[in-house]
Regions:
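Short beta-strand-to-loop junctions in surface cap/lid or active-site-entrance loops
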Residues: 35-43
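Active-site/substrate-binding loop(s) of hydrolase catalytic cores
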Residues: 44, 58-207
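The conserved beta1-alpha1 loop
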Residues: 51
Length: 225
């Protein structure tokens, strides 16, 4: 069996059997996101887990934080990248789904533009600097402060047949009552990742911008695992 190699992404390099908790620079330092990177001792796939694509969806964000806190490197095959909140500035300003500077929703802008507005440039950075490194993608969401919803999971539905099939298989592992096949290929982060050949899902759990430890976060952690 081939030995696990150091995992390199941007300016970061993580050795097998080690975990990194800190910041990842994107677009040559124009954006900085809080991440945890777990590089297992054994080779395997690279899984990307993101939260805070919409910064007011706190259940997904806390689930990513808790997963990074409790994940044991000894149990990891391959590499797991956890981005705890992509829209860091919007999270800090309680801006919800919309960009502070341009009023745009990141989850409507993929694949983004290299020379676009701030949100478009962030989408472009994620699509070109994160997605090429990963084999599977899980995006954690929840209902914003104006959204009531029943827990469900989207899986990518506009991609190559094998990508759609694997996305559905991933979705079937999530403990929610409903599963929805997406009908778009761009705009959303997971939709665009699938168009690049990456099986992807989006989990929705929690509502109204509320985080209650009596309900959703632990189940999201389990679903991500």
């Amino acid at each position: 069996m081939e030995a696990q190699k150091n995992f390199k992404i941007g300016t970061l390099e993580v050795k097998p059997g080690e975990a990194y908790h800190g910041k990842l620079e994107l677009s040559k330092g124009a954006f900085e996101v809080p991440v945890s990177v777990f590089c297992g001792k054994r080779p395997g796939q690279t899984v990307l887990i993101t939260a805070g694509v919409q910064a007011g969806e706190y259940v997904g964000i806390q689930s990513a934080i808790d997963l990074a806190r409790h994940l044991q490197i000894e149990k990891v095959n391959g590499t797991i990248i956890i981005v705890k909140v992509i829209r860091k500035e919007e999270f800090e300003h309680r801006a919800g789904s919309l960009g502070v500077k341009d009023g745009k929703n990141l989850n409507r802008e993929f694949p983004g533009k290299a020379d676009g507005t701030e949100t478009e440039r962030l989408a472009y950075a994620v699509a070109t600097e994160l997605f090429p490194y990963v084999d599977r993608y899980i995006d954690l969401h929840s209902g914003n402060d104006y959204e009531r919803l029943t827990p469900f999971v989207y899986y990518a539905g506009c991609a190559k047949e094998e990508v759609v099939a694997m996305s559905r298989k991933m979705a079937e592992q999530v403990d929610v009552p409903y599963m929805v096949r997406s009908a778009v290929a761009t705009g959303g982060a997971y939709n665009y990742a699938a168009s690049m050949g990456i099986p992807s899902i989006l989990i929705e759990r929690g509502e109204m911008g509320c985080l209650l430890y009596t309900s959703p976060s632990p189940r999201d952690i389990s679903g991500s695992r």
